[in-house]
């Protein structure tokens, strides 16, 4: 569970779950522009699965102990991911190359590039969202003249 494929949470017999960064805290959610994950579909399933775990106390990255409503926190995490997917899908009103999509996405979300390293990191953040739009059928891709174009499915 978590933002990276095959990440695990660990539970103890006394009702504590070490969830790491499988969920973002409310404070992080208020500031994050685009939650990171390797695979958006699996990330959403992970967040849903966390709500079914039988723990009363949680240890979260960027927060430490959390004894609040884990269902509510997971829902807020999933809502942000789904919101970003919907916003990014709207960009595909016209055919776009991956680079065009990334550029428009950065403008929409307010991500700025200052260095090449920032560009690469941002593309790593955006790629799973673009891939999820194709996986779930919201968008499709076509190759024309050795260039991949992404389209919104009607």
Regions found by a protein language model. Name each.
Residues 1-5:
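Short, small-residue-biased leader/transition segments that mark boundaries at the very start
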Residues 6-82:
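Metallo-beta-lactamase
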Residues 83-91:
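Pre-recognition alpha-helix immediately N-terminal to the DNA-recognition helix
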Residues 90-154:
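C-terminal regulatory/interaction regions
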């Amino acid at each position: 569970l978590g933002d990276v494929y095959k990440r695990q949470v660990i539970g103890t017999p006394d009702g504590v779950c070490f969830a790491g960064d499988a969920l973002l805290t409310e404070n992080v959610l208020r500031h994050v522009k685009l939650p990171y994950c390797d695979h958006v579909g699996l990330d959403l399933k992970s967040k849903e699965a966390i709500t079914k775990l039988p723990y009363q106390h949680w240890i979260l990255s960027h927060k430490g102990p959390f004894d609040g409503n884990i269902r509510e926190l997971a829902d807020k995490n999933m809502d942000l991911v789904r919101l970003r997917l919907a916003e990014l899908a709207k960009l595909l009103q016209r055919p776009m190359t991956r680079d065009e999509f990334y550029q428009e996405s950065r403008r929409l979300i307010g991500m700025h590039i200052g260095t090449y390293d920032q560009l690469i990191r941002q593309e790593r953040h955006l790629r799973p969202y673009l891939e999820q739009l194709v996986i779930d059928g919201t968008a499709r891709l076509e190759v024309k003249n050795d260039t991949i174009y992404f389209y919104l499915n009607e």
